[in-house]
């Protein structure tokens, strides 16, 4: 990374966790990612979910059809794990270069996850096959038992699911996605080379007070939900330390405005337009800009065993105002930090 006083030049980053949706929403949101990122790990929680090689190939084509001319972008597809998934289908997809990884959603943990896994025992043959193949398992790390408080679900997942699973399958490569707690930050930090984490901009920039004090801010509502300040600070300290197994994963998750601003609003922040500048702001605040490029562009490829991108992007330190909304055919999208003044923007 080269840093002049007002410009950051880094290798083209990748987004290791994104929701691109489908149909009109897909066509609207893809360019915000393909413009700045070389690759993205695309979540498979469509309706119906992406559980076959054929479905992944078709979805990948729909994504590519939405990439504007001149954008150099490769979607990396994932398989949605279900209790009934055939290990042979997963292996075929991985060997043919269709599936980069597989996604474990505990049933009903987040948007469109009702088909998710009821227990890791139910998919042990699949996980054993993944361990053998060296195929990464991407984990939404929350338990979903009704009696467990929503703010405790990540920490409880580590104790009851993640650690027993990694003990049982010590060769399994695992990405603990969108970590939100001090517990998870310490667990990943103290883990071995087969355990990594993605972290979103919203969990680095905000805590639950920002979402709940002085009025509910539905566009900060995502899952896993924002936690206490102590957890936010632990995440910030982890990335500022230059820890090499944490990397950029926006979890950008668009929903139309009427689905967010509702009596029962959807979870997800559409942060693709503003994420890169948001991360830069956090690293600057932590006096850690020397680690910014590794977090965005180097750590992820190293963990996945992929080459780093050859091209570069530049971020400029100048105040700009984020647009209030982005048009959809029958509604609008409200981007993360809508209407706010931001410090860093990507040079176009």
UniProtKB/Swiss-Prot annotation:
Alphabetical list of SUPFAM superfamilies matching this protein: Metallo-dependent hydrolases
EC class name: hydrolase
Residues with PTM N6-carboxylysine: 103
Binding site for Zn(2+) 1: 17, 19, 103, 251
Reactions listed under catalytic activity: (S)-dihydroorotate + H2O = N-carbamoyl-L-aspartate + H(+)
Effect of residue 251 to E: 4-fold increase in activity
Cofactor list: Zn(2+); Co(2+); Mg(2+); Ni(2+)
Tree of life domain: Bacteria
A cellular-component GO term for this protein: cytosol
Keyword set, alphabetical order: Hydrolase, Metal-binding, Pyrimidine biosynthesis, Zinc
EC numbers on record: 3.5.2.3
Residues given in the record as substrate binding sites: 19-21, 45, 140, 223, 255, 267
PROSITE patterns xrefs: DIHYDROOROTASE_2 (PS00483)
Residues the entry annotates as binding Zn(2+) 2: 103, 140, 178
InterPro entries tied to this protein: Amidohydro-rel, DHOdimr, Dihydroorotase_CS, Metal_Hydrolase
Effect of mutating residue 251 to A: Lack of activity
GO molecular function, one term: dihydroorotase activity
Active site feature: 251
NCBIfam families xref list: pyrC_dimer
Function comment: Catalyzes the reversible cyclization of carbamoyl aspartate to dihydroorotate.
Subunit structure: Homodimer.
The protein's name: Dihydroorotase
Species the sequence originates in: Klebsiella pneumoniae subsp. pneumoniae (strain ATCC 700721 / MGH 78578)
């Amino acid at each position: 990374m080269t840093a002049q006083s007002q410009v950051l030049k880094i290798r083209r980053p990748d987004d290791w966790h994104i929701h691109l949706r489908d149909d009109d929403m897909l066509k609207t949101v893809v360019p915000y990612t393909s413009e700045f990122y070389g690759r993205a790990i695309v979540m498979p929680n469509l309706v119906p979910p992406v559980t076959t090689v054929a479905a992944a190939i078709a979805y990948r084509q729909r994504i590519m059809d939405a990439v504007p001319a001149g954008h150099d972008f490769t979607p990396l597809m994932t398989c949605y794990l279900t209790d009934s998934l055939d290990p042979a289908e997963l292996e075929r997809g991985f060997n043919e270069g269709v599936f980069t990884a597989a996604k474990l959603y505990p049933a009903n943990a987040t948007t469109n996850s009702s088909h998710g896994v009821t227990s890791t025992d139910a998919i042990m043959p699949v996980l054993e096959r993944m361990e053998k193949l060296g195929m990464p398992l991407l984990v939404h790390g929350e338990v979903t038992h009704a009696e467990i408080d929503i703010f405790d679900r990540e920490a409880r997942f580590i104790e009851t699911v993640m650690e027993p699973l990694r003990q049982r399958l010590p060769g399994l490569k695992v990405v603990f996605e969108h970590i939100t707690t001090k517990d998870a930050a310490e667990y990943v930090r103290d883990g071995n080379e087969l355990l990594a984490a993605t972290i979103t901009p919203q969990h680095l920039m905000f805590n639950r007070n920002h979402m709940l004090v002085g009025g509910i801010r539905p566009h900060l509502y995502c899952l896993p939900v924002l936690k206490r300040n102590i957890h936010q600070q632990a995440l910030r300290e982890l990335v500022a330390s230059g820890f090499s197994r944490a990397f950029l994963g926006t979890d950008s998750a668009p929903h139309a405005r009427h689905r967010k601003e509702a009596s029962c609003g959807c979870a997800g922040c559409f942060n693709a337009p503003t994420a890169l500048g948001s991360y830069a702001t956090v690293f600057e605040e932590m006096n850690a800009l020397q680690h910014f490029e590794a977090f965005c562009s180097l750590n992820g490829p190293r963990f996945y065993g992929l080459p780093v991108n050859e091209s570069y992007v530049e971020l400029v330190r100048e105040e700009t105002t984020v647009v209030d909304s982005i048009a959809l055919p029958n509604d609008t999208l409200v981007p993360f930090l809508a209407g706010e003044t931001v410090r860093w923007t990507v040079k176009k």
